[in-house]
């Protein structure tokens, strides 16, 4: 069994088992702390409920935008390799969507590497679709930068589903065009 609880600053000393994955974006400590300070309700961890709890995954998000662009953004989500296929990522995504609805957001969005087919299929299974392709979003100091898909899922406030579009893979933009 697992427990979902708020992400605490002290968790930063216990999550190496989660972050040691080539597809997991890692950040400096001040970045994590700024999220925990500004958006504490959008940062949670999954933890084993054993006598010696172990972090199994986390999600960090934020609320941003104005007007019809007001949304919840998934900044990071990852699950430790030995805890995958247990439904933890789905639970954390559901949690963030629930908070987004409670904050009256129009949609939830996230960025995913265009080459990460497993993650893209996972998000599509949750109801997300590609809104646009961001050219060179992920920098690579040793080679060619990698594109990202901006994926979105409309929330209950977006009754007309204006936050999504068909064939989003064909709508290309630069990272400079991504602002809310």
From Swiss-Prot:
A GO-annotated cellular component: cytosol
PROSITE patterns in the cross-refs: GNAT
Residue span(s) of domain N-acetyltransferase: 2-156
GO biological process: protein maturation; regulation of actin cytoskeleton organization
Alphabetically ordered keywords of this record: Acyltransferase, Cytoplasm, Nucleus, Transferase
Pfam families tied to this protein: Acetyltransf_1 (PF00583)
Entry GO MF terms: protein N-terminal-methionine acetyltransferase activity; protein-N-terminal amino-acid acetyltransferase activity
The UniProt record lists the keyword S-adenosyl-L-methionine: no
Location(s) in or outside the cell: Cytoplasm; Nucleus
Catalytic activity: N-terminal L-methionyl-L-asparaginyl-[protein] + acetyl-CoA = N-terminal N(alpha)-acetyl-L-methionyl-L-asparaginyl-[protein] + CoA + H(+); N-terminal L-methionyl-L-glutaminyl-[protein] + acetyl-CoA = N-terminal N(alpha)-acetyl-L-methionyl-L-glutaminyl-[protein] + CoA + H(+); N-terminal L-methionyl-L-aspartyl-[protein] + acetyl-CoA = N-terminal N(alpha)-acetyl-L-methionyl-L-aspartyl-[protein] + CoA + H(+); N-terminal L-methionyl-L-glutamyl-[protein] + acetyl-CoA = N-terminal N(alpha)-acetyl-L-methionyl-L-glutamyl-[protein] + CoA + H(+)
Transmembrane as UniProt keyword: no
Main location: cytoplasm
EC number(s) stated in the UniProt entry for this protein: 2.3.1.254
Subunit and partners: Component of the N-terminal acetyltransferase B (NatB) complex.
Task of the protein: Catalytic subunit of the NatB N-terminal acetyltransferase, which catalyzes acetylation of the amino-terminal methionine residues of all proteins beginning with Met-Asp or Met-Glu and of some proteins beginning with Met-Asn, Met-Gln or Met-Met.
Family to which the UniProt record says this protein belongs: Belongs to the acetyltransferase family.
Name this protein carries in UniProt: N-terminal acetyltransferase B complex catalytic subunit naa20
Organism annotation: Schizosaccharomyces pombe (strain 972 / ATCC 24843)
Lineage start: Eukaryota, Fungi, Dikarya, Ascomycota, Taphrinomycotina
């Amino acid at each position: 069994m697992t427990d979902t609880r708020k992400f605490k600053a002290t968790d930063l000393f216990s999550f190496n088992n989660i972050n040691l994955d080539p597809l997991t974006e890692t950040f400096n400590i001040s970045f994590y702390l700024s999220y925990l300070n500004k958006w504490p309700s959008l940062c949670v961890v999954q933890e084993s409920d054993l006598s010696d709890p172990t972090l199994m995954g986390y999600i960090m998000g934020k609320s941003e935008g104005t007007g019809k662009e007001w949304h919840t953004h998934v900044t990071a989500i990852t699950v430790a390799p030995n805890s995958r296929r247990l439904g933890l990522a789905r639970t954390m995504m559901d949690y963030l969507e629930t908070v987004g609805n409670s904050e009256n957001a129009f949609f939830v969005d996230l960025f995913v590497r265009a080459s990460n087919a497993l993650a893209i299929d996972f998000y599509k299974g949750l109801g997300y679709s590609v809104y646009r392709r961001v050219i060179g979003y992920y920098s690579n100091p040793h080679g060619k930068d990698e594109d990202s898909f901006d994926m979105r899922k409309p929330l209950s406030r977006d009754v007309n589903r204006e936050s999504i579009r068909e064939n989003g893979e064909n709508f290309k933009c630069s990272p400079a065009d991504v602002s809310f």
